[in-house]
């Protein structure tokens, strides 16, 4: 089996990191941790 190029390995690692961060952000925004998020506009009602 021929070894893959280093550029392909780096590209896959960067893609996996971006997908992981995106998934974590969506989970934080819409999942159970979103109950602890504050809305700054609600804190400063006029």
UniProtKB/Swiss-Prot annotation:
Pfam families, sorted: PsbN
Lineage: superkingdom: Bacteria
Bilayer disposition of the protein: Single-pass membrane protein
GO biological process terms on file: photosynthesis
Record's keyword annotation contains Iron: no
Record has Ribosomal protein as a keyword: no
Transmembrane segments: 10-30
Main location: membrane
GO CC annotation terms, alphabetical: plasma membrane-derived thylakoid membrane
Record keywords: Membrane, Thylakoid, Transmembrane, Transmembrane helix
Subcellular localization: Cellular thylakoid membrane
Family per record: Belongs to the PsbN family.
HAMAP family in UniProt: PSII_PsbN
Functional description taken from the UniProt entry: May play a role in photosystem I and II biogenesis.
Record-given protein name: Protein PsbN
Annotated source species: Synechococcus sp. (strain WH7803)
């Amino acid at each position: 089996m021929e070894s893959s190029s280093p550029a392909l390995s780096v590209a896959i690692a960067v893609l996996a990191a971006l997908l992981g961060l995106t998934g974590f952000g969506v989970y934080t925004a819409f999942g159970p941790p979103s109950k602890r998020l504050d809305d700054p506009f609600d804190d400063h009602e006029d």
